[in-house]
Amino acid sequence: MPDGTEKEFRGKLIIGADGVSSLVAREVRGAEIDPKHTCVAYRAYYSGVKGMNNTLEIHFVKSIMPGYFWIFPAGNGLANVGVGMVMGSMKKANISLQKAMLGIIGQNEMFKERFATAAQVSPIGAWSLPLGSKKRVVHADSVLLVGDAAGLVDPFSGEGIGNALLSGKLAATVADEALSAGDTSSAFLARYDERLWGEISNELSMSYNMQRLGGVEWLLNFVVSKASSSGKAREAISGTFTNKEAKKEYASPLFYLKLFLS
């Protein structure tokens, strides 16, 4: 409590929506961290970055592949700047992402001029994101997990809000059913897992395949080259971030054959 005192609250059912470091999730499945399905990210805010507009920039920089470097407009002349990489890849490459981020900003030929007069206006923050490429248990006796607590981040785009909203909607429905039936057992709440993963598992599997393909440098260079020279190819590739059918195509060898012939 604000005054430093402790209070205990009890309920018939808990919906864990307490984020990446969820205490509720730890009670359900322990302090689980799977390096293959966890993304590590570092971020800071900068003012005075040159060339900013309303575009969300994602750059695949060789020094941190298969990770990426981003520059996002944050309003009021600020930029959200950071790097992200799957934990397993980071450990395998024995790379310090914080040093890599500062190196890209200060030394990389593509970016050092853009940051020449920029100022870092926040500390560098670090966090980990549990990716939805691993089908985790998201229920237990009297407990449902939603959002980042459930580990639903898209492994390709890093986006988690859409799946978080869906999980909240499904959890509310199952919670209502459980309370109406007077049954909050794990067996009853298992329907939440079934419904949630039934909705999102195929798309997350496709995103995971796309993430892995993005780590193949020559293939990524080929795709980017095609996007630069062909409006049709550019439209097809950008669609993979938002369109389920486009994601299916991206994960298929035929997609690259079409790009090659375009």
Where are these regions (language model features)?
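Short, flexible micro-motifs
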Residues: G19-S22, A44, W70, N80, ...
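Alpha-helix N-cap/helix-start capping motif
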Residues: D18-G19, K169, E217, G231
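Predominantly flavin-linked oxidoreductase catalytic cores and closely associated redox partners
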Residues: M1-T117, P130
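Short capping/connector residues at structural and topological boundaries
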Residues: G51, S63-M65, F69, A79, ...
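FAD/FMN-dependent oxidoreductases across multiple families
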Residues: K91-V174, S180
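A general structural signal for short secondary-structure boundary/capping elements
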Residues: H59-I64, G88-M90, G106-N108, A116-S122, ...
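C-terminal helical "tail/cap" subdomain of flavin- and related membrane-associated enzymes
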Residues: D176-S262
